[in-house]
């Protein structure tokens, strides 16, 4: 690489910017305005399935399930009265149920003791009624109601806890967004022309975050109105978790963005103490941030949980480019008094380094673009775009603004008076720190490298203890109501999250087949016991068409408990299903398809880390396959499967992104320094901090989740920036003097100052995440900030030590 010609090219580029400054400014304003016009289109997606790519096979199966059977994610409202069957409580429960149906939007169904089906046979007739359709008005009636409710198998762990102390209201929302023009479920048992149905399906979108928020807001408003000592309420369920995460995400983004702007303002003031030194970098980074979000809106990409770090990240990274350019510009301008010449000099001196640092940071982020986790891939793409936009504004808009607006000059002082003044300033303190770094790294180079090697070995031992985890509930504070409620309901109902088994008989009315019904019955009974065989999980409620058949069969046989079994003859199965359907109940729609070809089995389990679900999903699939007759197909889906797939994709994504980032950044370093051996050596200060942080996580038991897995590639992309500036300047000064120590000294006293400042800003940009209420962001911010600080230490101590050992302390 011919640096001289490249630097000359940047000087020529600066000349053209200066010559056409007003035209350049107008062009930048127009392009920026066009981008900004798309900002209102930005959306938010905190759904669990939002982590995966849209074409992920597991997600596609889950979407097919939702299209057929509706949304499985429910809001669970738990009420713990003093007496569950007291007339006053039942009256209030009925009112509460009615208000939910009347006021909560996007509803599909509400189920409680008020309207749960009660199947009974009377006078040779099958009756499927609401449990509280005939409200008991006597002690004997209430006693019978209590006995019927507590002894009914279908109500256990669904609407009533085993000890009878708790009852629930289950709220199911529509699967599809009403904004898309489609109804919730047109499948059911309605007939529609095939072409019309297909067209409607393509137009549908699933319930949006905004609509989910409307549901949660309406529910919580009712809960607040009814909450009391006689009606104590807890609320759980995935829709609530999604809304809590969204609110936290919006609050954190707003808080962290404003804090980051304030931090940047403060450090720019301390560093430059000039209006242009504060305002121009702020304009650059704010435009870079807003343009990045606008690009997301333009592409139809929603803000998701991982991408919430983008604002603080783009602000922190973007200011580094401006600081490096302005540091050189002001030093030159104060010395010569020629503003335009100082602009040319600054771009000629720093232009290549800014491009290389931007490209390496973008490469570190873009390595996520191949991730199997869709949200992480989007972070990689738009994080890289934000870095490149910051480079664009720094190299084009920043010099243009400097050329247009007046810049205050600090008159150049004699070296003695300047040194005397700087001895009592932040700059003087920084110079003493850098002098100490030069002394330690060059006089004790072998010791520095030896200590680094020991740290590396210890870190590798820690890395072997790393564990992947994905549990969005653990991201929330322990005392937050949704987490407390989920723990309570998992304990009392044995489950708030479901795994869904879909069984396809392969033919119309295949569910009349006694073999298939017998297999479904066996599967449902076995699922009651296997949970505690795996990871100590107690299986909760099982729901399927088997419940309907058993209830109907019992009702048609004088309500005798001995007949709570599935019929064994095809004709009897068909008759009982037909009788149930004609009874007026629509419960069958949620359990089988309209052709009676496909059946659904739901199993509720406690909320745990996704790693606990992987073995369960595999075991469920194995047992289902063993029980079903030959030719009958099955698949396991549901929210639990989404969690398990997210964890699997997380591990694959991390391995891919780390490998790609390390390879690409190494190639770019080799290209920059123009030497393979030197390029490889220069990667040591970049990789060591990441290794230490990962080792620290393993030793302390901090998990690798969807956020902390990002640390390696992000930190590598950022750490290499300082190394690029160090190597770029070291080679320049070494060519001039041929003296290693002198080259290191000049490097740290020019680029070193900017490296320290940008590291402080960058690390604070991530450390502010520790102010979040979400545990995953606290871990991510603290660990990434730690990696960035370690990277600076590596570039101030390890990189000079390596150069001393490679080139020797000779003139």
Language-model features: where?
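Hydrophobic transmembrane alpha-helices and their membrane-interface caps
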Residues: 277-325, 678-727, 767, 794-798, ...
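Pore- and gate-forming transmembrane helices of large, multi-pass membrane proteins
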Residues: 253, 282, 321, 334-371, ...
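Extracytoplasmic
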Residues: 1-259, 287-299, 303, 436, ...
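Alpha-helical transmembrane segments of multi-pass membrane proteins
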Residues: 15-19, 251, 255, 276, ...
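Hydrophobic, glycine/alanine-rich multi-pass transmembrane helices and their short helix-loop junctions
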Residues: 267, 355-398, 402-403, 666-670, ...
């Amino acid at each position: 690489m011919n640096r001289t010609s490249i630097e000359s090219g940047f000087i020529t580029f600066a000349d053209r910017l200066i010559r056409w400054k007003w035209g350049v400014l107008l062009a930048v304003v127009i392009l920026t305005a066009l981008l900004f016009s798309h900002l209102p289109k930005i959306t938010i997606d905190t759904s669990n399935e939002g982590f995966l790519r849209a074409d992920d096979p597991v997600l596609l199966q889950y979407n097919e399930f939702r299209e057929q059977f509706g949304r499985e994610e429910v809001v669970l409202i738990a009420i713990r009265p003093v007496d569950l069957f007291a007339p006053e409580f039942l009256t209030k429960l009925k009112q509460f149920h009615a208000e939910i149906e009347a006021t909560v939007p996007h509803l599909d169904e509400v189920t409680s003791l008020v309207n749960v089906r009660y199947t009974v046979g009377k006078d040779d007739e099958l009756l499927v009624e609401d449990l509280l359709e005939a409200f008991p008005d006597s002690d004997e009636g209430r006693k019978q109601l209590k006995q019927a409710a507590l002894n009914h198998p279908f109500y256990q762990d669904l609407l009533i806890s085993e000890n009878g102390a708790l009852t629930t209201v289950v709220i199911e929302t529509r699967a599809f967004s009403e904004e898309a023009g489609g109804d919730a479920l047109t499948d059911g048992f309605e007939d529609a022309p095939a072409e019309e149905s297909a067209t409607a399906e393509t137009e549908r979108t699933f319930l949006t975050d905004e609509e989910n928020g409307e549901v949660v807001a309406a529910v919580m408003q009712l809960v607040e109105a009814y909450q009391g000592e006689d009606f104590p309420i807890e609320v759980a369920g995935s829709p609530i978790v999604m809304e809590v995460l969204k609110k936290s995400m919006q609050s954190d983004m707003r808080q962290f963005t404003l804090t980051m702007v304030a931090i940047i303002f403060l450090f720019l003031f301390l560093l430059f103490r000039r209006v242009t030194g504060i305002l121009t970098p702020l304009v650059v980074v704010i435009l870079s941030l807003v343009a990045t979000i606008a690009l997301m809106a333009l592409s139809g990409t929603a803000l998701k949980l991982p991408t919430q770090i983008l604002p603080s990240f783009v602000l922190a990274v973007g200011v580094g480019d401006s600081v490096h350019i302005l540091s050189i510009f002001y030093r030159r301008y104060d010395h010569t008094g020629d503003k335009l010449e100082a602009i040319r000099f600054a771009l000629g001196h720093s232009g290549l380094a800014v491009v290389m640092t931007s490209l390496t940071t973008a490469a570190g982020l873009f390595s996520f673009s191949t991730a199997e986790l869709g949200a992480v891939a989007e972070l990689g793409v738009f994080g890289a775009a934000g870095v490149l936009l910051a480079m664009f504004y720094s190299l084009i808009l920043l010099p243009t603004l400097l050329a247009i607006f007046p810049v205050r000059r600090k008159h150049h002082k004699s070296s003695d008076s300047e040194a005397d003044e700087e001895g009592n300033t932040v700059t003087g303190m920084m110079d003493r720190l850098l002098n100490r770094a030069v002394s330690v790294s060059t006089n004790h180079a072998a010791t520095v490298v030896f200590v680094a090697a020991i740290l590396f070995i210890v870190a590798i031992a820690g890395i072997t203890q790393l564990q992947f985890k994905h549990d969005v509930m653990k991201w929330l504070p322990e005392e937050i109501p949704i987490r407390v409620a989920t723990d309570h309901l998992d304990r009392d109902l044995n489950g708030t999250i479901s795994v869904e088994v879909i069984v396809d008989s392969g033919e119309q009315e295949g569910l009349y087949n006694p073999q298939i019904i017998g297999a479904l019955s066996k599967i449902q009974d076995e699922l009651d016991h296997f949970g505690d065989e795996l990871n100590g999980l107690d299986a909760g409620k099982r729901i399927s068409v088997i419940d309907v058949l058993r209830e109907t069969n019992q009702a048609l046989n004088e309500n005798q408990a001995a007949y709570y079994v599935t019929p064994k003859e095809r004709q009897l199965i068909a008759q009982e299903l037909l009788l149930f359907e004609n009874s007026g109940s629509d419960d069958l729609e949620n359990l089988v398809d309209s052709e009676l070809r496909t059946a659904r089995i739901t199993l509720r389990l406690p909320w745990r880390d996704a790693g606990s679900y992987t073995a369960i999903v595999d075991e469920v699939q194995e047992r289902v396959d063993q029980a079903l007759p030959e030719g009958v197909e099955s698949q396991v889906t549901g929210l639990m499967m989404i969690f398990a797939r997210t964890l699997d994709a997380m591990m694959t994504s991390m391995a891919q992104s780390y490998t790609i980032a390390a390879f690409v950044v190494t190639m770019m370093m080799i290209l920059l320094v123009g030497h393979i051996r030197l390029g490889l050596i220069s990667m040591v200060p970049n990789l060591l901090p990441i290794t230490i942080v990962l080792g620290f996580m393993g030793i302390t038991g901090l998990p690798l989740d969807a956020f902390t897995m990002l640390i390696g590639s992000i930190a590598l992309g950022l750490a290499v920036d300082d190394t690029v500036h160090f190597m770029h300047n070291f080679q320049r000064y070494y060519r001039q003097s041929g003296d290693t120590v002198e080259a290191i000294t000049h490097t740290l006293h020019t680029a070193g100052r900017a490296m320290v400042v940008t590291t402080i800003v960058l690390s604070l940009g991530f450390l502010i995440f520790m102010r979040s209420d979400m545990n995953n962001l606290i871990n991510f911010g603290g660990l990434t900030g730690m990696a960035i600080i370690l990277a600076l230490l590596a570039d101030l101590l390890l990189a000079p030590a390596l150069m001393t050992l490679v080139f020797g302390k000779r003139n």
